[in-house]
Amino acid sequence: MSASPLDILQSVFGYASFRGPQQAIVEHVTAGGDALVLMPTGGGKSLCYQIPSLLRQGTGIVVSPLIALMQDQVDALREAGVAAAYLNSSLDAQAQRDVERQLLAGELNLLYVAPERLLTGRFLELLERTEVALFAIDEAHCVSQWGHDFRPEYRELTILHQRFAQVPRIALTATADPRTRDEIVERLALQDAQQFVSSFDRPNIRYAIAQRHNARSQLLTFLDGHRGDAGIVYCLSRRKVDETAAWLSEGGIEALPYHAGLDAATRAANQQRFLREDGIVMVATVAFGMGIDKPDVRFVAHLDLPRSMEGYYQETGRGGRDGLPADAWMVYGLSDVVTMSQMIAQSESGDDRKRVERAKLDFLLSYAEATQCRRELLLAAFGETFPGPCGNCDNCLEPPKTWDATVPAQKALSAVYRSGQRFGSGHVIDILRGIDGERMNQLGHDRLTTFGIGADMDEKQWRSVFRQLLAAGLLATDPEGFGTLRLTTASREVLVGERKIHMREETRPARRASRRRDSQLITGASLGIEAYEQSLWDALRALRSKLAKQHGVPAYVIFHDATLLAMLRAMPENEGDLAEVSGVGEAKLKRYGRDFLDVINAKE
């Protein structure tokens, strides 16, 4: 009797049941149908083509642009007992010939290949001499010329339909709006493709945004809750990446920089350390992340605003891919708004593109200043309605206090108008607070009717008002004027008293714990590990690291954090008990079961 999809899921991958639409997708593709799968990061897309490849006759060919990721994906499959290989430029000629021989001999269940390799005449001829089970086209949004990850070679993959019409194809992506989905189906010539669209929601990620006061101090306070965790800290500039990685390292945190300005060898070495070691913090520009499949990233922090909600979703989505709790944390301030506006204005894009970018920034700003559930707003950006509140974002957990800021807003807008809409927030705040000085006198601004009318509020309070006016679209920065402020069409309603304005109260940042208390923080705290479980948790992770080094694979390839946590809670006494733990398949049980049981039994 042949194996069923559930048999393969349990015996090979060690999971008791499918999640979401996985089973329907697997059955559809196994039966020979084309499919487009839109599933969020961490949703289990890989199983949707891996299991059909094991159930169908022949070899599953996986097309992926992420060369750096292929080896880890193949290592993980081999550890699970699957015959897998990859073909890319990192292999020498002999190794490539060995893989081709295995393919022709029918010895492989799965072969990963880059699109540019697949499209060569030689490789296509090789495939015609091979029994192909299916084609899986990963990161399928790369086909869209409107997307930020456009890869021209993806548009040539129509050839798979032309030359292998009877072989099913499954296109997968974590990010595609309806327009991009239609483009994927058209460009790849998918035939009667069934579309499986999952929710964009990542319920295990906790979203939080704080006003920037002292970014370094705020980041350190945040990291105190992630002692020993792997995470990513995003910065806008290369210089800020280098500086942040340096001072984190000086503070005893294993932090590495990553940006396009580093030489290729350094980037590769830092990426390998991040993937293969526990507890590394990668400080990076957005150049880092595409193709990072590390499941146990416990936090993603932004020290600067991302470019759009899509960018924010994609970057924060690199946390918690194993389904365990992860934090998406960001600080931002008034300067971010000015900087991002200038970047859009000074780019070489056409006017239409700039308008789109500006609208995306406006949406992101309204998200950052929102007082309602963050998850509701985030999913709304992708056309999805969430029946909030979610209970797992800062606004749900600690609803922000608001205040009636109508009068201060009117004063601020009046000061911008009366000073000629030619100055930035710093000078306008000085006008409002009545700060006298030589420049103020030269400009004659000490004689404006708005001079000193805001003296009852300090600079910090006024900066908050201006930041929130910008986020609400009641002020705009002049793209040609180096951050100078101007009124918008919406400003009039406020000025004439037709619209009330409520703003978030400024919150004081939490003070960092003392050094003595810091030393008592435990690793794994972000996963809810208690102090009495600490020694066993550390022992399980130490064993995993040791085995990973011996086998030359990343630690998560041995077992995910989720599997170690399940062991910690189940306390299995024998191999039968361990086989029941989620993530422990037959091959891994045979290879590592005794080692992990010895550690668990020694701690009882």
Segments and roles (model prediction):
Residues M1-I8, V356-R358, T385-E604:
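Accessory DNA-binding and partner-docking regions appended to nucleic-acid-acting proteins
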Residues S2-V12, A16-G20, A24-L36, P40-S46, ...:
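Helicase motor core with emphasis on the C-terminal RecA-like subdomain
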Residues D352-E384:
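Short, charged low-complexity linear segments at domain edges
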